[in-house]
Amino acid sequence: MTDAAVSFAKDFLAGGVAAAISKTAVAPIERVKLLLQVQHASKQITADKQYKGIIDCVVRIPKEQGVLSFWRGNLANVIRHFPTQALNFAFKDKYKQIFLGGVDKRTQFWRYFAGNLASGGAAGATSLCFVYPLDFARTRLAADVGKAGAEREFRGLGDCLVKIYKSDGIKGLYQGFNVSVQGIIIYRAAYFGIYDTAKGMLPDPKNTHIVISWMIAQTVTAVAGLTSYPFDTVRRRMMMQSGRKGTDIMYTGTLDCWRKIARDEGGKAFFKGAWSNVLRGMGGAFALVLYDEIKKYT
């Protein structure tokens, strides 16, 4: 193997392992966030059974579905995030070579910043093309509030993918893809762009204390997450449409979804579950720092 191939493989492995660990740790928070986001578009959750907020959701899930249901859909999330994060981190460096070749970060700050934004956004959008059906399945499995057996909409990852494919074809597995690309570019641009720019401005980036790295990463993930959150809410709502027919279809398209959420639920609805998303972001920040630490020893 060439040095470039070895470097790419190390990036792939380090990013994937870091993501798998952090996502499993924050899976319960992720499920609460998803339920709050999509409950208005769920056929299983009637108006009188909707969750009132994070605490209500955390208390009711183990009572109604069992403690292990906090990790419902987590396998799909880990499978999805191994290639997603690994491809993001790996492609990020490849895109950086394209957008930042020959740029001096000290004398060309704004050119350096723009290059980081572009490389982060392009990396996120590229990886999303490959793993979107897994992202879709993860959302639908987490939104499934049936206790067991016949009450469940899907038996697992494979069952979810097969049922939606039979019902709606490949289009059903990519429902909400366009708004996802918009959101992922905004999120990744901030996630990688600001993080790398901030680290690049430190006196000695290679030997930055892990606490400083974590603080930078935590701020970046919180800001990036809130900025792109409305896009995430719309895409999750669109994902809930797949498999529906006739009058069960709530939104005719992405623009209709934006309009109806704003009209029927108000602007705050776009940010339902956002606080749990900030908490979940601690896992994302941890993954970013863990990736840097793993690379020091590889």
UniProtKB/Swiss-Prot annotation:
Annotated keywords: Acetylation, Antiport, Chromosome partition, Membrane, Methylation, Mitochondrion, Mitochondrion inner membrane, Phosphoprotein, Repeat, Transmembrane, Transmembrane helix, Transport
UniProt catalytic activity: ADP(in) + ATP(out) = ADP(out) + ATP(in); H(+)(in) = H(+)(out)
Residues with the N-acetylthreonine modification: T2
N6,N6,N6-trimethyllysine found at: K52
Binding site for ADP: R80, K92, R235
Domain of life: Eukaryota
Annotated transmembrane regions: 8-37, 75-99, 110-130, 179-199, 211-231, 274-291
Pfam families according to UniProt: Mito_carr
Post-translational changes noted in the entry: Trimethylated by ANTKMT at Lys-52.
Sequence ranges on the Mitochondrial intermembrane membrane side: 1-7, 100-109, 200-210, 292-298
Presence of keyword Transport: yes
Cellular compartments annotated: Mitochondrion inner membrane; Membrane
Region of interest: Important for transport activity: 235-240
Record-listed N-acetylmethionine modification sites: M1
Regulation of this protein's activity per its record: The matrix-open state (m-state) is inhibited by the membrane-permeable bongkrekic acid (BKA). The cytoplasmic-open state (c-state) is inhibited by the membrane-impermeable toxic inhibitor carboxyatractyloside (CATR). Proton transporter activity is inhibited by ADP:ATP antiporter activity.
Modified residue annotations for Phosphoserine: S7
Subunit organization: Monomer. Component of the MMXD complex, which includes CIAO1, ERCC2, CIAO2B, MMS19 and SLC25A5/ANT2. Interacts with AK4. Interacts with TIMM44; leading to inhibit the presequence translocase TIMM23, thereby promoting stabilization of PINK1.
Family affiliation: Belongs to the mitochondrial carrier (TC 2.A.29) family.
Domain notes: The transmembrane helices are not perpendicular to the plane of the membrane, but cross the membrane at an angle. Odd-numbered transmembrane helices exhibit a sharp kink, due to the presence of a conserved proline residue.
Protein name from the UniProt record: ADP/ATP translocase 2
Organism: Pongo abelii (Sumatran orangutan)
